[in-house]
Amino acid sequence: MAWTPLLLLLLSHCTGSLSQPVLTQPTSLSASPGASARFTCTLRSGINVGTYRIYWYQQKPGSLPRYLLRYKSDSDKQQGSGVPSRFSGSKDASTNAGLLLISGLQSEDEADYYCAIWYSSTS
């Protein structure tokens, strides 16, 4: 089987109600099957990643977005129905970013990935 890189695309940015970029994501990421991928969703200055739930979605051409997971902390997270455990969430406080980690990449993971945030005052 020939080596084929996976191209995983990300939404370049999301806008908030004030029409200022709130979240930024790299435009694309390429990785090999079997490798791991790490997607970042960086919140703008003044928005603390620690107080937000980060939601991740996957969208393939011609399909609706699929909910993958929600992550705020190790004690406040949720995996989407039927989503394999090789998809996981995390945060990097030093860069004020939410992370989507995919281990053991498969060809079926080639898709667009989107993040969204929701404020949560609960611990």
From Swiss-Prot:
Residues 116-123 are annotated as: Complementarity-determining-3. Residues 78-115 are annotated as: Framework-3. Residues 45-53 are annotated as: Complementarity-determining-1. Its main location: secreted. Keywords: Adaptive immunity, Cell membrane, Disulfide bond, Immunity, Immunoglobulin, Immunoglobulin domain, Membrane, Secreted, Signal. The keyword Nuclease does not apply. InterPro entries: Ig-like_dom, Ig-like_dom_sf, Ig-like_fold, Ig_sub, Ig_V-set, IgV_Light_Chain. The keyword Membrane applies. Disulfide bonds join 41-115. Residues 20-44 are annotated as: Framework-1. Residues 21-123 form the Ig-like domain. GO terms for biological process: adaptive immune response; immune response. Residues 1-19 form the signal peptide. It is found in: Secreted; Cell membrane. Residues 54-70 are annotated as: Framework-2. Gene3D superfamilies: Immunoglobulins (2.60.40.10). PROSITE patterns: IG_LIKE (PS50835). GO terms for cellular component: extracellular region; immunoglobulin complex; plasma membrane. Residues 71-77 are annotated as: Complementarity-determining-2. V region of the variable domain of immunoglobulin light chains that participates in the antigen recognition. Immunoglobulins, also known as antibodies, are membrane-bound or secreted glycoproteins produced by B lymphocytes. In the recognition phase of humoral immunity, the membrane-bound immunoglobulins serve as receptors which, upon binding of a specific antigen, trigger the clonal expansion and differentiation of B lymphocytes into immunoglobulins-secreting plasma cells. Immunoglobulins are composed of two identical heavy chains and two identical light chains; disulfide-linked. This is Immunoglobulin lambda variable 5-39.
